[in-house]
C-alpha cells in the first residue's frame, strides 16, 4: 500500500496477497473488508441521477429529461460538479463515522444514456431524450462534472448505463432479445455510449436484456468487439442488479449460477451487482474459469478504487476536506433554480403567464405535489 509506488505496482502487490475467495468478493458490489491487509469494506452501489439519491439531504436538480431541455452543456457540467462536491462531503463524513454502506461510496451509476424512443417507457425521465447526439453531448458534460480533471484522482466515478438497446418496457427486460438493424444500432442506440467512452467515463453498466441474441452483460459483440475493441474502453463494466441471474433464469443461455458467473467474467463483466459471483468459487473448481481471468476483472476494479483515492491517506486526496456545510447550500439551491428555469419549455400559454405580481397564493396540485422524494 506504499503510496509512492506506481498504481499498477500497488495493484500487483495487493492481488498477490489476496486469496481466491477474497478476490471473488471484490467482484461483488458489496465488498467485505480484508482486515489483515488493511483493505476497507466498500459498497459500489450509489445513485446520482439528478442529485445524490437515497442518502439523506442533498440538492435536488430537475429530472434529467428536464436538464436535457436546457441544451446547456456548461450548466449540466456545473450541476454534476455540485453533485460530486456533495458526494465527497457525504462520503468522507460517513467514513469518518465508520459507515461504508450502500449509497455512501463514490461510484455513481449515472448517467442513463438510453434513448427515450417510446413515451410509454416509465423511466424515460431518467434520460436525456430521444436524440443520440444531444444525449451524448449532455451525458459527456455530466461525466466531466462528476469525475473532475485531476491528473491522478477521480472526484467520483461515473457510469454510462444501460448498455445497450435498453429503452423499456420494464416488465420484459429480464428476458427480452432486442434485435435492432445494424443501422439503428450504430446510429441510434450506441452513439451516446461511444461519446461517453471518448469523454473518459470510468464505468459502463450492462443491461438486463439480450441484444442480437447475447445477454448484454456477456456480449462478445457489445463488450468485446465494440466497447473494448473499437472504442478502446479501459474502465470497468458492472452488471445491472441481478442481471447475471437472468442468464440461467430467464435468457436460458446457461444452466447454473456458476456457469452464468463464469460466462459474464470471461466476456468482460467485471463487477456483479448482486450475489451470483459468489459461485465463481464453484466455477473455478469445475474449470469453467481460471483464477487469471478473475484477476483481470479484479485489476480493473482495483484501478478504479485507487483512482478514487480509497487506499490513500485522506490528506493526500483532493476534496477530502469539503465540508458537509455545502450540502443543499444556498449557492447549490440557486444553481438548481437556474437549471429548473432553463429546463422549462412553454408549449401553450392562453394568457396565463406571466403571473400577476399581486397573487397572494398558488395551488400546486396532483398526486405527487407534496412528495419531495418524487419531485
Model features per residue range: what roles?
Residues 1-375:
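Glycoside hydrolase catalytic-domain context in secreted enzymes
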